[in-house]
UniProtKB/Swiss-Prot annotation:
Keywords: Cell wall, Secreted. This is Unknown protein 1. One of its GO terms (cellular component) is extracellular region. It comes from the Eukaryota. The keyword Secreted applies. It is found in: Secreted, Cell wall. The lineage of its organism: Eukaryota, Viridiplantae, Streptophyta, Embryophyta, Tracheophyta.
Amino acid sequence: NPVLPCPVGSLYK
């Protein structure tokens, strides 16, 4: 699970 500074963090988590 890459923790990237994006507005849609829910999709990246």
